Amino acid sequence: MIIKPRVRGFICVSTHPTGCEANVREQIDYVKARGPIANGPKKVLVIGASTGYGLAARISAAFGSDAATLGVFFERAGSETKAGTAGWYNTAAFEKFATEKGLYATSINGDAFSDEVKARTIEVIKRDLGQVDLVVYSLAAPKRTHPKSGEVFSSTLKPVGKAVNLRGIDTDKEVIKETVLEPATQKEIDDTVAVMGGEDWQMWIDALLEAGVLADGAKTTAFTYLGEKITHDIYWNGSIGAAKKDLDQKVLGIREKLAAKGGDARVSVLKAVVTQASSAIPMMPLYLSLLFKVMKEKGTHEGCIEQVYGLYKDSLYGAAPHIDEEGRLRADYKELDPEVQNRVQELWTQVTNDNIYELTDFSGYKTDFLRLFGFEIAGVDYEADVNPDVQIPKLVQV
């Protein structure tokens, strides 16, 4: 079938298998061109491995450090008549290229919050790898079923304590709009912490430690975004911020446990990029469009693969890691450059319906958004017939 982008709100409901493969190849080529990561990881578990930062973490480990990788995610296969999810095609492509290079690559498809997926992951590590020396936690999910109580929690994107008026772009109509977000209730805050906080990361590490599948000296990192004052009402000071603060608390206990084995645990702060998660946040398309404009002009613009490869090389496995006073690894320092933030802040109030394309890089934002789903990739023939039924040969389905 011939597949074209079909966008509804902040989701593209179609995906292009060939485009997703080309996108993965571009990221692999970037890592290969930058050269190997000195003293990098060799056996890596990535939880949330199929898109965005998690996929970049898997690619960087495999092609920057010749690592065996095990990826966990929750994706949907395609059929002859219906496209699957982008993460499915990304993984099929990644496994194909990793196998061609002679690298171990296996994937587990299921709910990473569940005990079943944790148990199955441990089985596969024991069978194939023995132990892992890096665990990357990169889950982005709107809901979580608690593995012990069975309670279902939903995350909420709201301010805390006061209503907030946010500027943003209506990405369908391409106009500036103001959105009023009412404050979260205590239950909404608690539920957001249950979904996006550090409990599941801690459960993963505890399960891996108990099973004896974490190598001596093993590291773990969880990815997060903090942003600057322009996004603070909705991030750091909002319901999501409560979850991020929980992550900062939970990492201390995880670090202590791993330190006993000569290892380490860190929260890694990455820059704002276009992802399926960020496009759902009312102000982010406008913020990202302005950020892209300013950072591209400065020559400091980066996407997922540049960020994560840099995080591995400079901080996770570098001699002089970028670390803040809270002990977090920072890869977002180019975004937080005061010159960049001040310029974004200046432009923030100047943007109108008439000058969106002039003052912002909204066209770059739209391209990046479509690239998530395998569209707008150079060299791909979008008029060609494509089969959406793509297999992942080494998939473990839970």
Swiss-Prot record:
Q: Which GO MF terms does the UniProt record name?
A: enoyl-[acyl-carrier-protein] reductase (NADH) activity; NAD binding; trans-2-enoyl-CoA reductase (NADH) activity
Q: Where is this site: Plays an important role in discriminating NADH against NADPH?
A: 75
Protein EC: 1.3.1.9
Which keywords does UniProt give here? Fatty acid biosynthesis, Fatty acid metabolism, Lipid biosynthesis, Lipid metabolism, NAD, Oxidoreductase
Gene3D superfamilies for the chain: NAD(P)-binding Rossmann-like Domain
Biological processes per GO annotation: fatty acid biosynthetic process
Q: Which reaction does it catalyse?
A: a 2,3-saturated acyl-[ACP] + NAD(+) = a (2E)-enoyl-[ACP] + NADH + H(+)
Show the active-site residues.
Answer: 235 (proton donor)
Q: Which residues bind NAD(+)?
A: 48-53, 74-75, 111-112, 139-140, 244, 273-275
From the UniProt record, give the pathway where this protein acts. Answer: Lipid metabolism; fatty acid biosynthesis
Any idea which positions bind substrate? 225
Q: Could you describe the subunit structure of this protein?
A: Monomer.
The record's NCBIfam families line, in alphabetical order, gives: EnoyACPredFabV, PRK13656.1
Its family remark reads: Belongs to the TER reductase family.
Function, in words = Involved in the final reduction of the elongation cycle of fatty acid synthesis (FAS II). Catalyzes the reduction of a carbon-carbon double bond in an enoyl moiety that is covalently linked to an acyl carrier protein (ACP).
Protein name, per record: Enoyl-[acyl-carrier-protein] reductase [NADH]
Organism taxonomic ancestry: Bacteria, Pseudomonadati, Pseudomonadota, Betaproteobacteria, Burkholderiales
Give me the gene this protein comes from. Answer: fabV
